[in-house]
Design a protein with these regions (language model features):
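C-terminal motif of bacterial Sec signal peptides marking the signal peptidase cleavage site
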Residues: 13-16
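C-terminal amphipathic alpha-helix
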Residues: 21-65, 104-161
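Bacterial N-terminal signal peptides that target proteins for export
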Residues: 1-6
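Short, solvent-exposed, charged loop/turn and helix-capping segments
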Residues: 71-99, 112
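Short, charge-rich amphipathic alpha-helices with coiled-coil/heptad character
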Residues: 18-20, 78
C-alpha cells in the first residue's frame, strides 16, 4: 500500500514538473511579443542617436526636452510590464535587471542647466544607454529562448543603423 502511494505521488510530481517547461515557454513568448510592440520606438531611438550625433543638425532646447520625454515614456511603458505576473524566475529576474538598468537613462538625460552643447551630449548619452541596455536585454532573452528550445524564430530584432 505504501509503495502504491509513493508511486502515485512520484507520478504526479513528474507530471507536474513536465508542464513547467511548457508554461515557461509560453510566458517567454508572451513577454517577447509585448516587447515586440516597442519596435517602432526602437527605430525612433536609432533616429534620435543619428540626429543628436550629427553636429551639422541644429538641436534646440525644446528638441532635447522632447527626447527626454520620449526616454521617460519609454521607461514608464517598460515598467508597466509587471514582473509579479511572471512565474518564470529567470525571466522575472532578467526583466527586473533590465528595468533597473534602463531607468538610469532618466538620470543621464536630466537638464543640468549647462550650455546647450553639453546638454545635447548628456541626452545623446542617455539615448545610447537606452539602446545599449535594450540590445543587451534582447540578447539575454535570446539566450533564454534557446535554452527553452522554442522552435519559433526569436521575434526581437534591433533595427539596423
Amino acid at each position: 500500500m505504501l509503495r502504491s502511494v509513493t508511486m502515485l505521488a512520484l507520478a504526479i510530481g513528474l507530471t507536474a514538473c513536465g508542464d513547467g517547461g511548457q508554461a515557461e515557454r509560453v510566458e517567454l513568448a508572451d513577454y517577447a511579443s509585448k516587447l515586440k510592440e516597442f519596435d517602432g520606438r526602437n527605430r525612433e531611438i536609432m533616429g534620435q542617436i543619428e540626429r543628436l550625433d550629427d553636429p551639422s543638425k541644429d538641436v534646440s532646447a525644446e528638441d532635447l526636452e522632447q527626447v527626454r520625454q520620449f526616454i521617460a515614456a519609454y521607461i514608464s511603458d517598460i515598467e508597466k510590464i509587471d514582473p509579479v505576473n511572471l512565474e518564470y524566475r529567470r525571466l522575472r529576474q532578467t526583466h527586473k535587471t533590465y528595468v533597473s538598468k534602463v531607468s538610469q537613462a532618466n538620470e543621464l538625460a536630466v537638464d543640468t542647466g549647462k550650455p546647450l552643447r553639453n546638454e545635447r551630449g548628456n541626452v545623446s548619452i542617455a539615448v545610447r544607454h537606452l539602446e545599449k541596455r535594450t540590445r543587451a536585454h534582447h540578447t539575454a532573452l535570446d539566450v533564454l529562448w534557446l535554452q527553452k528550445k522554442i522552435e519559433d524564430p526569436f521575434p526581437l530584432v534591433w533595427p539596423e543603423e
